[in-house]
């Protein structure tokens, strides 16, 4: 069965797992975790822009010529486009030069500026302020005031290129990617890869790169029985093959129509095949069904040598291992991914929340810490804070769920909070009710830092005391702890079956905090947000040195990031795979495998993040 998704209207929601604090109503809970130039014949008009902005990797010689770009444009038959900031039509200057504003187009942009679906459907649409604007430079951006979208921006606001790649390819097939890699090998131009635009660390764009945009690879195929290619004796399983542009809403709706359960993101517009899966992918279902990477059966991608490859545990097994944990933007351009699904089954939700005060958060944190091992044994998974929880189980009916949650529910009722225990016929129906329709917070600078905590902090009295003291102090200081019972605590898999840090297999919680800054924050305010983020990362590491950081939601400036993301042994293997498949380093991204720490200050492409490195 083959299906191509339509551009159905969906309410945008915040990505990832950012916050569930102060739930006013149940639907908002999950949200708080969480082409300008298509005609090649006109290429010469703006070729000067890319000659100025496109930069080869360190050590490469020269820049692409006008002839190089013309050749690429002809090969791509109109799918090479100029990358222009989303809000450019609202400004009368661009990159320091006069530029005509387009009031009609600007009005349309202002109308949907905070719409995550709208942003996901534009190459220049990035979810967070640091996605297209330089975090350490207040003028190297082109953004609107999200609090005042009723009028065009004032004449004093800048509109500059920011981090948006000056050229991008609207990828529709493997041949488009192969053409891009030929161009990159010939000219030394680096490649960046963007699917949905959900990225706290900006791995999906790179100044001076040729961007590859995969949003329009939206094929979906259900397999009643799937065997990976070339894997003799493989047990057939239910699976779905997703193109790399399919987002979470589209994927879950498709899974529901095929009566299966899919482990996926808890944000409507995250691409299910992108960085969410390739860097791990934690979900409310992960304690029972594993991480996103644990569900992957086969990957189709184009590597930088231009080869179209099928990867699984038999074919290109080294690459398959590396992709499942460290694969985003690093080893090739993923075109599609086949993931295992399970038969649809009922799911029960426990949703509890109360208004936090200085006095009532520590007792609730104590309840969470002490009940987590038993809840994990009961199949519960999901997000929590010092005043709320939203846990899901495939194993509890409503009566069993009420019994399991009794202590926490009694406490919440005592604080005049709300308690909801509700069962749904399928996970897809739960997703449609609570996640697909959740509200959105786009356009802010969001800097989460989360850490995988070892089980000893829950299983041992001293560990529980240390964890409670740490989180309670942060809560008293008005730093909301974000706690995710989403590591694969009950899911059994061989230790080295993926390139994920081994600490994930010995954990109940992924926990941490978030710093933020406004779109128009001063450099000093942005630096302070970065300092707070780095302080949280340092303190979490001190609390749980044997834990790990999650590449998707770690501090962008994490110390010892190779060890913290993957572990020393894994990283050595990952680097060897990188050298084998991308020896020229055409794919570069911040703190990805192969990143050279010297680039932090030596490479202009990384200067925006690099300016705030080492504040703590």
UniProtKB/Swiss-Prot annotation:
- What upregulates it? Expression is positively regulated by the cluster-specific transcription factor cheR that binds directly to an asymmetric direct repeat present in the promoter.
User: So, what pathway does this thing act in?
Assistant: Secondary metabolite biosynthesis
Give yes or no: UniProt keyword Oxidoreductase: yes
Q: What happens when the gene is disrupted?
A: Impairs the production of chaetoglobosin A but leads to the accumulation of 20-dihydrochaetoglobosin A.
Q: Membrane-spanning residues where?
A: none
The record's InterPro entries line, in alphabetical order, gives: BBE, FAD-bd_PCMH, FAD-bd_PCMH-like_sf, FAD-bd_PCMH_sub2, FAD-linked_Oxidoreductases_BP, Oxid_FAD_bind_N
Give the intrachain disulfide bonds: none
For this chain, the family text in UniProt reads: Belongs to the oxygen-dependent FAD-linked oxidoreductase family.
What is the annotated role of this protein in its UniProt record?
FAD-linked oxidoreductase; part of the gene cluster that mediates the biosynthesis of chaetoglobosin A which has a unique inhibitory activity against actin polymerization in mammalian cells. Chaetoglobosin A and its intermediates are involved in the morphological differentiation of C.globosum. The first step of the pathway is the synthesis of prochaetoglobosin I via condensation of one acetyl-CoA, 8 malonyl-CoA, and a L-tryptophan molecule by the PKS-NRPS hybrid synthetase cheA, followed by reduction of backbone double bond to install desired geometry by the enoyl reductase cheB.
Q: What is this protein called?
A: FAD-linked oxidoreductase cheF
Which organism is this entry from? Chaetomium globosum (strain ATCC 6205 / CBS 148.51 / DSM 1962 / NBRC 6347 / NRRL 1970) (Soil fungus)
Its lineage opens with: Eukaryota, Fungi, Dikarya, Ascomycota, Pezizomycotina
